[in-house]
From Swiss-Prot:
It comes from Rhodopseudomonas palustris (strain BisB5). It holds the Pfam family AAA_26. This is ATP-dependent dethiobiotin synthetase BioD. Mg(2+) binds at residues 17, 100. GO terms for biological process: biotin biosynthetic process. It is an enzyme of class 6 (ligase). It catalyses: (7R,8S)-7,8-diammoniononanoate + CO2 + ATP = (4R,5S)-dethiobiotin + ADP + phosphate + 3 H(+). Keywords: ATP-binding, Biotin biosynthesis, Cytoplasm, Ligase, Magnesium, Metal-binding, Nucleotide-binding.
C-alpha cells in the first residue's frame, strides 16, 4: 500500500531535494519527481540517487523531463511539450512514497494550473520545507495558509539552515503546525553525513503520524 508524502517548499533553492533524499533514505521509500525542468546539470532525481543511499530501482522516472531550467509552464512551452496535470497521478508503490514538487506551492505547471492545484487533488500529507533566514516567517505562514485554504493536510514544517529559534517558534505557533525538525547546512554533503544529520534532528515516526 502506498503511503505518499509530498515535499514542497516556501521557495526555490530552499533545500527540498537534499531533504527529500534524507527523508526517502530514512524511510527506505520510493522517490518521484513528477516534473524536472533543467537537464544540463545534475537533476533532482540523480541528486537523490547520489545522496539517499537508495538503489536506483527506488527512484521512479519523471513524468516530464524539460530542457530549460525555468518554471515548468514556460519550460514546457519552450520544449513544445504540453503538460497534462490530470495525468499526474500518484504511483502505486509498496510502502512510503516521497514526492518532490518544484519551487513553491504556486509554481505554474501550465497557464492555468499550479502545483498546489495538483496537490489538492491528491490530498496527500505535505511536508513544508522552510528556510531559517530573514523573510522565512512571512513566506512560511503564507504557504501554510495556502495549504489550509485548499484543505491539503500539513504533516509539518522541516526547517533547513542555521538555527533561528525565534523564527521557528513563531512560525509553529502562528501557523498551528508541527515542527518536524531542522536540517543544518552540511560542510560535506555526502550520503553518510546527510543520514547522520537527519537521524540527529528528525524522528522518522513523525512522518507517519496523522496530519495537523
Amino acid at each position: 500500500m502506498t503511503t505518499p508524502i509530498i515535499v514542497t517548499g516556501t521557495d526555490t533553492g530552499v533545500g527540498k531535494t537534499v531533504f527529500s533524499a534524507a527523508l526517502a533514505g530514512a524511510l527506505e521509500a520510493t522517490y518521484w519527481k513528477p516534473v524536472q525542468a533543467g537537464l544540463d546539470e545534475e537533476t533532482d532525481r540523480l541528486a537523490v540517487l547520489r545522496l539517499s543511499g537508495l538503489p536506483e530501482t527506488r527512484l521512479l522516472a519523471e513524468a516530464y523531463r524539460l530542457t530549460t531550467p525555468a518554471s515548468p509552464h514556460l519550460a514546457a512551452e519552450i520544449d513544445g511539450v504540453a503538460i497534462d496535470p490530470e495525468a499526474l497521478v500518484l504511483p502505486d508503490t509498496q510502502g512510503p512514497l516521497v514526492v518532490e514538487g518544484a519551487g513553491g506551492l504556486l509554481v505554474p505547471l501550465t497557464r492555468h494550473v499550479t502545483y498546489i492545484d495538483v496537490f489538492a487533488t491528491w490530498r496527500a500529507p505535505v511536508v513544508l520545507c522552510a528556510r531559517t533566514t530573514l523573510g522565512t516567517i512571512n513566506h512560511t505562514l503564507l504557504s501554510i495558509e495556502a495549504l489550509r485554504a485548499r484543505a491539503i493536510p500539513l504533516l509539518g514544517i522541516a526547517f533547513i539552515g542555521d538555527e533561528n529559534a525565534e523564527s521557528e517558534r513563531i512560525i509553529v505557533e502562528l501557523g498551528r503546525a508541527r515542527r518536524l525538525g531542522r536540517l543544518p547546512h552540511l560542510a560535506q554533503l555526502t550520503t553518510d553525513a546527510l543520514r547522520a544529520a537527519f537521524a540527529r534532528n528528525f524522528n522518522t515516526a513523525d512522518f507517519l503520524k496523522e496530519t495537523a
